[in-house]
From Swiss-Prot:
Organism, scientific name: Escherichia coli O157:H7
Residues holding [4Fe-4S] cluster: 938, 941, 944, 948
Domain of life: Bacteria
The protein's name in its UniProt record: Putative oxidoreductase YgfK
UniProt keyword terms in alphabetical order: 4Fe-4S, Iron, Iron-sulfur, Metal-binding
InterPro entries: 4Fe4S_Fe-S-bd, 4Fe4S_Fe_S_CS, DPD_II, FAD/NAD-bd_sf, FAD/NAD-binding_dom, Helical_ferredxn, Se_rdtase_YgfK
């Protein structure tokens, strides 16, 4: 039911593992080719125990269930830090409890199971890992992994009988009936020759059949002590002494990042850009102090030496913070991940200096593929992770981390290299990975509800105004098929030269790689396609023949939207004439946007190719041209693309006349007109046009300073971030929360200081006047606000307008006048070039559909995709990136980084620690794979909802496989429960009971259940292991 996890019985766990492996060559969703095989001869020792890799899952969501531990092992985890247990083992936790959007926050800390159930999960995993090692990585040197027990939170609780039973059974389970039961179950399975033959294990028959008797009864020799934030020093020391003296366990004690002190922690977070993370100074007052820790650790190290045991520290615990995000319940939340790294590694440096590198350190605090090599090379080991495994790629990030470590020369290091650690601690304060800006704030999203089926989507495509086939053309570039890539681009994009330079690349703000490292440089790849593919593409290109039966089309305006419309329609055989009042085509791109942003020859390239399709251009046309006149000239369709070429300006008191409007200024600048602006120019506004004006003004002779004045803050600024950064690079200065009021003849510009109030209808906080003013000495002022369409001209043309003065159009841009369309900025105001092309595309698609013409044919590029190859990229982070100057290396890199999400998404599968979401291939759907949710495995942590690009929650909205009737009854999820020959099905809060035969076939399926029943049948026939028993 909902957040109640149902453990898998041991025998059923083995069935699940082997049946999935036989059916899919995967185990818990990890493909066989991505099972990690440790490098022979490289091991690490932790207090006398040997493990084949120094990495593993931290005590947390990845070590709570048996299947989580199995999955960790499959992907390279060999130091398994089991989830913390405590005497209070029946707490009810509010959900969701994880927010891993960037730095991670959580509101849970110990296992959600009772002590008995937790121990049982660890025992199942203990047996399963021994079996998997014998199957896939047999060795004469014994097991390659270490189980490390994690207990908390006070000595009184630890001494209670249930905790004592748990600890004792972890140390020696020989007398526990469960151990004998699981050994007998495993022995029975391995004595079955049919089972061994079915899985190709006959050659290992002898060693496998001897395995059950060899499995040790002691699961742990070490413990990691976890204490609550604010635990008194004497209590921490008492628990450590108890573990060393009474239990004889090698001990790590987990310490808090608060050891650095409030001022230092606050300083580090602020310097790294995480100033919004709220801290309570009094929390630091209650925590262990550094001087107390040093004294305590010295005593405990001496005690451990006396007892011939190991003792060290686990660095670090999470950081307690104020819950100010509103994403999780409660007043406090606990931070981990990359924001914790500079804190934890500096704690490690402080302690290592104090103990001259002789204090063993188990590490977990922002470890990832980007930091793990540096951590390991200091001599710190083991290294465990939780936050990084909650991101897309999931457990596969463990394998990627291990590949980073394989080439290290620090495997034999038996102490901490203090000098090296000091350097790393200093670097951690400035390295890109630890700075907040490393991960953009944009959330990858598809602004539609999560569908029940066929949910694989490339967010880059959905974010694109023209729905460019981005994954496909990137794959073609990676195969050096440049002309094919360009052909595919041209299917939807009439202006690749222009959009390769000045596209707002919404695709990059919605690239799945943002959850790994950085977005693909998609816009630059488009440039490469044109550069490398143009010659071959042009050679095989043929001018459209045209057709006498196609209706003539008139397009008013030869800017980006008009050019795109002409291209799409001429390509389909329509005779097209573009009517332009200027002496050239290109509109704002040609005449307004400064040429330092895009070379004129590239603009002309796109114009010339449109003309090559047979589009006619008539320049110098009368601005009084009307729809009626064009209709009278036998143009069946009329498209109006006149743009927004009017500035509203700004009303100022004062008598200074040196005020220019942005569009006339930029037009004169592009013409090369000698402009006299003086030394200091102020630009009012903060859109892209304002950025162009400020950058252009700085290039005018005599101008020494350009300042942008904006009445809101940087966060509300409408300019693209890229345009803002380029303006900064050019030397443009910015004054936010300032609004001009008066401009006097002596050059005094009076600015009203503003503050931010409540959000407006667009979500931007409204500027509110204060009583404060400031003045600047200014020579010229340029207003870059309020670009709008010329409503008088539109009225004169005969275009119907709505009550707000905008053209009255439908989704395709068609007006209330049949066959008359509005496209580009004139439709709804200033937008991007690619958005203008998008409006042209929608309008021309509507026309071509009316004419019974298919608008594009690119199916030939949608095949030949290997899901296994795509899946291979899922765990990898790009440590270093080549820039685009080396074109061949750049293309190879970006093609290898593309995750082709519309073919293999399964982010919800990746990020689920419990393996509660699965993807299976089901015939008969648009997507090759369908995603199912397994109710029994889910605790509703919310992590899959965080990373799903759709508006929805996979754990609530996907087809759910139920294992128990009570859980089906207590849920509202769409899904099904198989009960022998009956299947209970629920969809849209309506329920059915259907009959299913032994072959998985239904009779008399209601039409609305066709898709769901097709999936149920497929699961019944080919993935029956998903229907196995669970424990109540």
């Amino acid at each position: 039911m909902g957040d109640i996890m149902r453990p898998i019985p041991f025998e059923e766990l083995l069935t699940r593992i082997f049946d999935e492996y036989q059916q899919q060559r995967s185990i818990f969703g990890i493909p066989e080719q991505q099972f990690y095989s440790p490098v022979k001869g490289k091991t690490v020792s932790v207090f006398g125990e040997t493990c084949a890799t120094p990495v593993g899952p931290a005590a947390g969501p990845h070590t709570q269930l048996a299947q989580n531990i199995v999955t960790s092992w499959l992907t390279g985890g060999r130091f398994i830090e089991l989830k913390t247990v405590q005497i209070l083992d029946r707490l009810e936790l509010e959900k969701p409890c994880i927010d891993a959007e960037d730095e991670c926050f959580n509101t849970e800390w110990s296992t959600e199971f009772t002590l008995l159930k937790a121990w049982d999960e660890y025992l199942k995993a203990w047996f399963a890992l021994h079996l998997l090692e014998a199957m896939f990585q047999p060795s004469d040197s014994g097991k390659s992994f270490i189980f490390n027990m994690s207990v908390g939170y006070n000595l009184e609780g630890i001494k209670q009988p249930p905790m004592q039973q748990f600890i004792d059974n972890m140390m020696d389970a020989s007398d526990h009936p469960k151990f004998a039961q699981y050994r007998d179950t495993l022995n029975k399975l391995l004595q079955d020759d049919a089972f061994l033959a079915r899985h190709g294990l006959q050659e290992k028959r002898e060693s496998l059949q001897a395995l059950p008797a060899r499995i040790p009864t002691s699961m742990v020799h070490g413990v990691t002590l976890s204490t609550m934030h604010g635990c008194p020093p004497h209590e921490i020391e008492a628990i450590c002494r108890y573990m060393l003296e009474e239990k004889g366990l090698n001990t790590f004690v987990k310490l808090n990042p608060t050891l650095l002190g409030y001022a230092r922690v606050r300083e580090i977070l602020d310097v790294c850009g995480f100033g919004y993370i709220g801290l309570k100074e009094e929390s630091f007052d209650h925590d262990l102090k550094l001087t107390q820790a040093l004294e305590m650790l010295e005593r405990l190290m001496a005690l451990a030496k006396e007892k011939s045991l190991g003792f060290g520290v686990k660095l670090t615990n999470t950081l307690g913070t104020i819950n100010n995000k509103g994403a999780l319940p409660g007043e406090e939340m606990y931070m981990s991940g990359r924001a914790l790294f500079p804190l934890s590694i500096n704690v490690a440096a402080v302690l290592s200096r104090a103990f001259d590198g002789k204090l063993p350190i188990s590490y977990s605090g922002g470890a990832s593929q980007l930091t793990i090599r540096d951590i390991f090379d200091t001599g710190i080991r083991p290294i465990t992770m939780a936050t990084d495994l909650l991101k897309p790629g999931g457990y596969l990030r463990l394998s990627a981390c291990m590949r980073e470590l394989e080439g290290s020369d620090a495997w034999g290091l038996d102490h901490v290299d203090v000098e090296r650690l000091n350097r790393l601690a200093a670097d951690a304060l400035t390295m890109e990975y630890t700075q907040k800006h490393w991960k953009p704030e944009e959330r990858i999203e598809v602004a539609e509800d999560l569908p029940l089926t066929d949910c694989y989507v490339a967010p880059c495509v959905t974010a694109c105004a023209i729905k460019q086939d981005i994954p496909e053309y990137i794959r073609l570039l990676g195969e050096h098929r440049y002309a094919d890539a360009l052909e595919l681009i041209y299917q939807r994009n009439a202006l690749p030269a222009i959009t390769g330079h000045i596209c707002d690349h919404q695709c990059q703000y919605n690239c799945t790689r943002l959850d790994y490292d950085s977005a693909l440089n998609i816009r630059e790849l488009k440039k490469v396609a044109l550069e490398k593919g143009w010659d071959e593409y042009k050679q095989r290109w043929h001018k459209p023949a045209g057709s006498g039966s196609r209706h003539p089309v008139a397009v008013i305006g030869a800017g980006p939207a008009g050019l795109a419309a002409g291209y799409f329609l001429a390509r389909a055989g329509h005779p097209v004439t573009l009517f332009e009042r200027e002496a050239n085509a290109g509109g704002v791109v040609k005449n307004i946007i400064p040429q330092f942003r895009i070379p004129a020859e590239l603009i002309q390239h796109d114009i010339d190719f449109v003309a090559a399709h047979g589009v006619k251009f008539e320049y110098g046309c009368s601005p009084d041209l009307t729809v009626e006149q064009l209709k009278n000239q036998d143009f069946h369709y009329v498209l109006i693309a006149t743009g927004t070429d009017k500035n509203s300006g700004v009303k100022l008191a004062g008598d200074n006349q040196n005020v220019l409007k942005s569009l006339p200024f930029l037009r004169e600048y592009n013409k090369g007109t000698a402009l006299k602006l003086g030394k200091h120019v102020v630009v009012v506004g903060a859109g892209n046009t304002a950025m162009d004006c400020a950058r252009a003004a700085l290039r005018v002779p005599g101008v020494e300073k350009a300042t942008v004045v904006y009445r809101r803050s940087l966060q509300e600024m409408p300019a693209w971030r890229e345009e803002y950064e380029e303006a900064l690079h050019d030397g443009v200065e910015f004054r936010f929360l300032n609004n001009p009021e008066r401009f006097d003849a002596d050059g005094t510009l009076t600015l009203r200081v503003m503050s931010l109030g409540e959000p407006d209808e667009k979500g931007r906080r409204r500027p509110v006047e204060t009583n404060e003013t400031v003045t600047l000495h200014v020579d010229s002022l340029i207003t870059a606000i309020g670009e709008q369409q010329d409503t008088e001209a539109l009225n004169a043309m005969g275009v119907p307008l709505d009550k707000n003065g905008w053209p009255d159009v439908d989704h395709n841009g068609e007006t209330r006048l049949t066959d008359v369309f509005m496209i580009g900025d004139v439709q709804r105001g200033p937008s991007s070039i690619v958005a203008a092309v998008g409006t042209a595309r929608r309008a021309t698609d509507a026309i071509l559909s009316r004419e019974n013409i298919r608008s594009h044919q690119n199916d030939k590029y949608w095949n030949n995709v290997n899901p296994a190859e795509i899946y291979q990229r899922k765990g990898d982070i790009s440590i270093t990136l080549v820039n685009s100057d080396d074109r061949d290396a750049f293309v190879a890199q970006e093609a290898a980084r593309c995750l082709e999400c519309n073919y293999v998404c399964s982010k919800c599968v990746d990020v689920c620690p419990n393996r509660a979401n699965v993807s299976i291939a089901v015939p008969g759907f648009q997507n090759r794979f369908q995603t199912l949710h397994l109710d029994a495995y889910c605790n509703e942590c919310g992590n899959c909802a965080q990373f799903c690009p759709w508006n929805g929650k996979p754990y609530k909205d996907k087809i759910t496989v139920f294992s128990l009737a009570q859980d089906f009854d207590n849920s509202s999820n769409p899904g099904f429960l198989v009960e022998d020959c009956r299947v209970r099905v629920r969809l849209n809060n309506q329920s059915w009971v259907l009959n299913i035969d032994s072959e998985g076939q239904f009779n008399n399926v209601p039409p609305e259940l066709n898709d769901m029943c097709r999936i149920i049948s497929h699961v019944h026939q080919h993935h029956h292991y998903l229907l196995g028993r669970v424990e109540v």
